[in-house]
Amino acid sequence: MDPFTEKLLERTRARRENLQKKMADRPTAGTRTAALNKRPREPLLEANHQPPAPAEEAKPSSKPSPSKRRCSDNASTPDAGAENKQPKTPELPKTELSAVASHQQLRATNQTPQVSLLSSDKELTASDVKDASSVKTRMQKLADQRRYWDNNVSPSSSPPAHVPPKDIIVSPPKPQIPDVGNDTPVGRRGRFANLAATIGSWEDDLSHPFVKPNNKQEKPGTACLSKESTTSSASASMNSHSVKQDTTSCSQRPKDTTVNKAVCSGQLKNILPASKPASSVASTEVSGKSKPLAIKSPAVVTSKPNENVLPASSSLKPVSANSSPQKTERPASRIYSYQSASARNELNNNTPVQTQQKDKVATSGGVGIKSFLERFGEKCQEHSPAPLNQGHRTAVLTPNTKSIQERLLKQNDISSTASLAQQQKKEREKELAALRGRYDRRNVWTKQEDEQQGTFPETSSNLPTSDVASCSETKRAEASGITSEKSVSGHFHPNMAEQVSSPEKIPTPVQSQLPLESPRLVNEGNTGNVACEVEMSVDGSIEEINSSGIITNIFSDVLEQHDEEGEEVDECLVEQVETDTDDEEREDEEEDALNISSMSLLAPLAETVGIESPKALLSPSNKVAAGNGESCDRKRSGRFQKSHVLRAESNDGIGSSEENQNLLYSIDAYRSQRFKETDRPPIMQTIVRKEDVSSRLQDKKTASPLSVNIKQKMKTLSNEVNLQQTVIHQASQALNCCIDEDHGKGSETEAEAERLLIVATEKRAALIAELNKIKNEGPQSQKKNVSNESAPSRGCISVSEMFLPLKADFVCNATQRMDSANYYFFLMIRAGAENIVASPLTSITSTMKGDALAFPTTFSLEDVSNDFEICVEVYSLVQKKEGHAPDKKKKTMKSKAITPKRLLTSITKSNMHTPALASPGGPNAVRTSNFVLVGSHKLTLSSIGSNKFPLDKVPFLSPLEGHIYLKIKCHVNSSVEDKGFLTMFEDVSGFGAWHRRWCVLSGYCISYWTYPDDEKRKKPIGRINLANCTSRKIEPANREFCARPNTFELITVRPQREGDRETLVSQCRDTLCVTKNWLSADTKEERNLWMQKLNQFLVDLRMWQPNACYRPASKP
């Protein structure tokens, strides 16, 4: 025997001994009342309805009697001889449980005198005297219990003071048990029939504690119960046990030995049929025919589940009623979704007791889910002292049980602890809703409140009683395959917790898919059904099915309450449940008994983790569903769309959760992320370079000069030539009309026409020259400009604030002789054929500022290279005014009457006086402008920094002084930047040291810090100004002087300062201090990249700002 089994057996023995001591210490009713608040530890066997037996070790019994098997499954039997006597002790509790259950459900059936119970108690006492001393003690306690119970049932009975608290619950089974021990099986059946009749005569007595003593006695398994007694107790326990009790047994069950596990699995298969017939049939029938009922029961919704259930039940025929409380409870829990209205009412009547137990559980464990060990410890403490608690307690606080508790707590006063726990749960759910709402674009809990008038936890807690039953009934009516269960399902609602604890093992097809499928069935029927199914599927912690997936599906169902696809989806799901039952049962047997998830409260967040679809949660269920047909797939996909944030429109979209893979998987992670971002915003930095930045830099260079298609460019130039030709033609026509003063001769309008004519003419000539150049050279001219690797970055040039000074004597004479002539000037700025701009027309009379003409035009060029050339040209026009004699003649001529002959003569005379005659070609002839070029200047990169430039080609008699004033600015579009670690060589007290620095290349300097984070928070340790660099080109350091690999050298110069001295890195020459900067990169590639970027910086700096940096020394 392995050490684990030995320890398990030792603990079981210790618990039994402890139970015996406690049972001996509390013989009075007062002691029992006090014990209600505390439960002793229980063995690791199935604990749903059976607390461990005090005296005996668990030994599997080989006897065929059903009672014996039941005892062996739950606990070991001490002696073969005591078989009849000891079973009585467990039988009493079972009968008590059955009595309580039937009392809840069949209270109006039959009313049998309680004298028979008393007589049975006496018989039991007599048989107990013959047993060993331990047996005698237990039997005396049982007798006291019976008496006390009899007193409670009928107020006229003897006072219950001497009766132990455990015996209070079950009186009817007790009379039968003594008979069972002494009589033949036939007598047992008769007594069981009497017991059923007695149970039927009972009336509701909420103050009467039930079930707990039965559980304790049953668990020890000291004696074997008769078939009849076992069956009756099992059926009664099925009916009497509350959902909480069932949950408790399930939670403890994982710790049971392997024998118990096998029994549980078998029981689960048989549970549904056995429990359903037992509840549907009268208690009298249960005593004798529990086996066949279990086999014949129509409880299974689908054909496949029925097949699975029948063989299981047949294998356990002696325990047809599933004497073990776990077995009975599990089927009940599956059927729980289909409870009838009568069952609801009975459960509501028993609500006070359940409420007390649930309050207790909530106080100890809280609403949240605890680990299996914690829940088992609490159950062991609460089991023995309070039979009341055993009858209806929920030791396992699974989400199902929790929701049921909340419901009952609402109906009766909720304890302060439970209220606080519920409030915390709601807060967590709100946070979950906020997280999910970011993608759902709606508030999940708001929709639930609109539909259910409450949050999900409240609804689920309210549903376990009558609401659940009504929901289940409505659902059954809708589903085609579930109609057969209507009659039976109503009686098994107390056992719903069993299904919660082990949904996979339960044979009912609807429940087999607890995590996902069963909730859908219920939701389709009614809104109440949603909560009902929720509770059934929440406790998936024991199975392989992830509890988070179950709760996720539950939440999705709550969101889908108003779907109109109920009936069709139900049919599809029923078919799926049939095929899924077998797989889930096999998986459940292989699962870890302690696999209880403590994160089930955070289950809704499972959607935002890597879970792609329901496939990740329920692989078998989804596989089956996939083959159910297009209609079923369509509806299921619609449901999954709601349950998952992806909200895909088809099944194909369900599986892709790439959008949610980066989401946080828990509330704690979300909070820590939020606080972290608030306290310290992240600084995005790239420490390791994974891409070839040099290639990116080369791409920028190549792409900077816009490469235009040659044909497209030629077409554009041709269009522009045609446009300028049109302007020339129109300007010529205007000038041809200016024949005298009346027609604009000598006016500013004529001068403007002359300006348009000269500008259009110059543009046309430049465009034609460019077009011919492209035709002759082709695209080779562009390639030459781009091919240079060390070409500097391109920049922007702007020319503004242009002034044209005039001679001082000319200005004085012009002001004195204003009527002599008009002088017009304008500037034409050229930067290639495509960039020609003309300034507005200016004259001495209109735009004179002092002794200079001002031109407000601003000329800008984008994306130009450093070898740009801008030509500024000055054009002048002189209009001489005519004498007054012609005006007098015109006046005298106008006074005469106008005749055709006179008109012709006047036109001829006026043409004679026109200084600029029209072209001989007529009014449509093309003219040549009278503007004359009087000065020009070319601006280049070297012009930057100056504002006065000489004019070329200025005539001697021109009024221009010979200079032009303008402001030229340039901006380099250099985007070369880099960051990374470099190891710098420094002189430390006369010794060379290499220090690793975080270097940033920006703004024509290299700034360095110790750590990357310091860049945003601290001033740099130092800077290397590239403007002071005298290296013609940055190259690797000479290995003769620097042996460190991947090192490059950067030489800088600065004016010498006082206190400068020579070091390992600096030397003083004349008035300059020369510094050698050795910078070492981590890899050769990084070194080459740094060198390339630094060289680009130097080229840009020296080309665009030649006066702002030191020029490299000329080579000798």
Curated annotation (Swiss-Prot):
It holds the Pfam family Anillin_N. Residues 101-119, 304-326, 336-356, 453-472 have a biased composition (Polar residues). The keyword Cell membrane does not apply. PROSITE patterns: PH_DOMAIN. Keywords: Actin-binding, Cell cycle, Cell division, Cell projection, Coiled coil, Cytoplasm, Cytoskeleton, Mitosis, Nucleus. This is Anillin. The keyword Cell division applies. GO terms for cellular component: actomyosin contractile ring; bleb; cell cortex; nucleus.
